Design a protein with these regions (language model features):
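Structural recognition of alpha->loop->beta junctions
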Residues: 48-65, 107-120, 201-218
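Conserved mixed alpha/beta catalytic, RNA-binding, or beta-rich assembly cores of soluble enzyme
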Residues: 1-4, 128, 185-209
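Surface-exposed amphipathic alpha-helices with a cationic face
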Residues: 19-30, 52, 79-84, 170-175
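Distinct, well-ordered alpha-helical segments
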Residues: 15-23, 44-51, 71-75, 103-106, ...
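Core AdoMet radical
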Residues: 1-14, 28-43, 54-75, 88-97, ...
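Radical SAM enzyme core and accessory elements
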Residues: 199, 204-302
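Conserved C-terminal portion of the radical SAM core fold
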Residues: 74-161, 167-193
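Short acidic, gly/pro-rich beta-turn/loop elements at beta-sheet edges
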Residues: 46, 71, 101, 128-130, ...
Length: 302
């Protein structure tokens, strides 16, 4: 194991257990990169020393941009303390529309403290307590997804304006030559992480391609009257084909799509997710069909 993280809730509400966790990690995996997520309030010098001795390599603080100035100042003091003991000190926080000037000022403060970097999160409309967000005038980003699916990991939907502000902040950091790293984590990135966890290492037949771009399993499909001509051409090139008698289509590996450029047929790219129904049962669920043009298709683009 190369990486491990402890998050919450607030892990430092249970300091002995938190430091014990990292000690155990260090004992079993001496070279592991161990990370702690915290809001910062419970961190004191003794705890920071204990975390250092337990092998903690990175600490990430959460700062609420709408907190009172005195509370933010307190967290900044905790960050300054952490810099004395923990090799990598980061901040991770959502980008709330309308907070641009406050965020720019915070970036400058963090840079002055020598913080290694900040992870800007796309702000999300929660799947619960939506009324409180509506009251603040937040609206959904449209479209909410590039590919519609039951994304459970992120627990929300992207809020309009958050991504635009995040990119503005990245540009601000560049233009002002800030030394801290600035990373943007979109909701789409979290969705891709979920799909990757569901799909990677899952055995599938040779008609599927695991996309390194978005982690979907992808295959090509041809329907109806086009099947005969396409199947004959694929047979000449020894391309494996799967038949669906029920839905009247064939599917094959996307790398063969470019072979069909001379045929007057319509080809679709099928995007799929593995759903694990139990320890022994799984299902391949198609979540989107995309029309593709064989003459311009490239496997590297998907």
């Amino acid at each position: 194991m190369q990486f491990a993280a402890l998050t919450g809730g607030e892990p430092l509400l249970h300091k002995a257990e938190a430091t014990g966790f990292f000690k155990r990690l260090q004992h079993h995996f001496p070279d592991i990169h161990a990370r702690l997520y915290t809001a910062g309030d419970p961190l004191d010098e003794k705890t920071a020393q204990q975390l250092q001795q337990a092998g903690l390599k990175e600490i990430r603080f959460s700062i609420k941009i709408d907190d009172p100035a005195e509370k933010q100042a307190r967290i900044l003091r905790r960050i300054r303390l952490a810099k004395k003991y923990i090799p990598t000190v980061m901040v991770e926080m959502p980008v709330i529309p309308g907070s641009g000037e406050q965020m720019k000022a915070l970036l400058c403060e963090l840079d002055a403290l020598g913080v290694d970097g900040i992870n800007l999160l796309e702000f999300c409309f929660p799947l619960a307590n939506a009324a409180a967000f509506r009251e603040r005038g937040f609206t959904l980003k449209y479209p909410p997804y590039q590919v519609y699916y039951n994304y459970w990991y992120a627990g929300g939907l992207a809020i309009a304006g958050s991504e635009t502000l995040a990119l503005e902040l990245m540009l601000f950091a560049l233009e002002n030559a800030l030394k801290l790293g600035v990373h943007y984590c979109s909701l789409e990135n979290k969705h891709t992480g979920q799909v990757f966890q569901q799909n990677h290492l899952s055995p599938v037949d040779k008609t599927y391609y695991f996309s390194p771009r978005d982690a979907f399993f992808k295959c090509a499909k041809v329907f109806g009257s086009a099947i005969t001509a396409v199947e004959a051409l694929l047979a000449q090139h020894h391309i494996p084909v799967r038949h669906s008698q029920q839905h009247h289509y064939i599917q094959f590996h996307p790398s063969a799509i470019s072979l069909l450029g001379a045929l007057p047929v319509e080809v679709c790219l099928s995007l799929n997710v593995i759903e694990h129904l139990s320890e022994t049962e799984r299902d391949v669920k198609e979540v989107q069909l995309q029309h593709v043009t064989p003459s311009t298709f490239s496997l590297a683009d998907i």
